[in-house]
Amino acid sequence: MDKLLIRGGRALHGEVTVSGAKNAALPELCAALLSSEPVTLRNVPRLQDVATMLKLIRNMGVSAEHDDSGTVRINAGSLSNPEAPYELVKTMRASVLALGPLLARFGQARVSLPGGCAIGSRPVDQHIKGLQAMGAEIVVENGYMNACLPGHLKRLQGARITTDMVTVTGTENFLMAAVLAEGETVLENAAMEPEIGDLAEMLIKMGARIEGHGTGRIVIQGVERLGGCEHQVVADRIEAGTFLCAVAATGGNALLRNGRADHLGAVIDKLKDAGAEVSAEDGGIRVRAAGKLKAQSFRTTEYPGFPTDMQAQFMALNLVAEGCSMVTETIFENRFMHVDEMLRLGAQITTDGRVATITGSQSLSGAAVMATDLRASASLVIAGLVAKGETLVDRIYHLDRGYDRMEDKLRGLGADIERVSQ
């Protein structure tokens, strides 16, 4: 099993290129199922979750090739098996995103209940209720969502859908289902993440009629068919945020090429409050540590608030900043699993329910630690970069789910880091 060996204490300097966003690429791969014409996606990151999604759609009979330049060419004209089996999706939450497109185009789908995440419950009931409002009949049995249209319907029907909570994958599923539905669909309480806006832009290129993406109310006028398109996946704001925290925590200075400062407002504001200099530059984001950092308290919320996917990484920065801070996690109920591993490095953190209290300005010492989920693994890498001595991060398959060649990019910034097999 691969591990990362980090010898800490080096400031990060130079330039790094931010990859395409995993959380945009996955729904956009599913969106290609909506058309029988060729779709080309560029800037697709080489990640384990992407490889799993490609394997899934190939299993449906779809032609899909991912080349070394990050381009994926898909032709779903040959799709013959509208099923997402458990064996292929048990490691990945995003499998549920196949449900809407398959229902919209074929009127039927059989999708395994998703797996792939240890950080908390993410029930699919909102997906089911929304698609039922559009006329679908869905039965959950034996670990599968079995969906179809009743005999009197040839297409999904437009509807007004208001979810009980903001749901990113739910918004994406409804968006993809609605573009081929009959009539108008209105999504209230819609998620506003940039990745949803990017998905909508791709669908519009395919011929969809969508307004309001990027707001809490999206209106879709259904069309009878969609064509192919070429689309570039938006840059990964979470990867960019991770590198911003790593550079600032190590006292470095770096340019993040392709980084979108307009997608990271809440994180950048906290970094500036901590004393880092962060600015948008032509082609990216510049971050420079300017003296000792000051610990910052924050609360995770839906976009455009502070992202839950950046909670662990910013906590790692707070470990070496001056002062005490409180981190409140409002999105997931089990997202402090990295805390126990940080304690092994000498961190001083206490937790009470969804609140973690961190005493900063600590001297961390390298140790063997274990990744428990995707973003926790990134936070342990950051902690290892600032710790004295060697840190060995185990179970980095979690990291590979969402970061494209992270150790290579960090090494390019001057980190002493290598992948080892033990």
From Swiss-Prot:
What does the record give as EC number?
2.5.1.7
Q: Where does UDP-N-acetyl-alpha-D-glucosamine bind?
A: R93, R122, P123, V124, D125, Q126, D309, I331
What Pfam family does this protein match (any one)? EPSP_synthase
Q: In which pathway does it act?
A: Cell wall biogenesis; peptidoglycan biosynthesis
What's the chief localization of this chain?
cytoplasm
Please provide the record's keywords in A-Z order: Cell cycle, Cell division, Cell shape, Cell wall biogenesis/degradation, Cytoplasm, Peptidoglycan synthesis, Pyruvate, Transferase
Q: Where in this protein does the record say 2-(S-cysteinyl)pyruvic acid O-phosphothioketal is found?
A: C117
Disulfide bridges in this chain:
none
Q: Which CDD domains match?
A: UdpNAET (cd01555)
In which residues is phosphoenolpyruvate bound?
Answer: K22, N23
Task: Give compartment(s).
Answer: Cytoplasm
The UniProt catalytic activity note for this protein reads: phosphoenolpyruvate + UDP-N-acetyl-alpha-D-glucosamine = UDP-N-acetyl-3-O-(1-carboxyvinyl)-alpha-D-glucosamine + phosphate
Q: What cellular-component terms does GO give this entry?
A: cytoplasm
Classify the source by domain of life: Bacteria
The record's PANTHER family line, in alphabetical order, gives: UDP-N-ACETYLGLUCOSAMINE 1-CARBOXYVINYLTRANSFERASE
**UniProt name for this protein:** UDP-N-acetylglucosamine 1-carboxyvinyltransferase
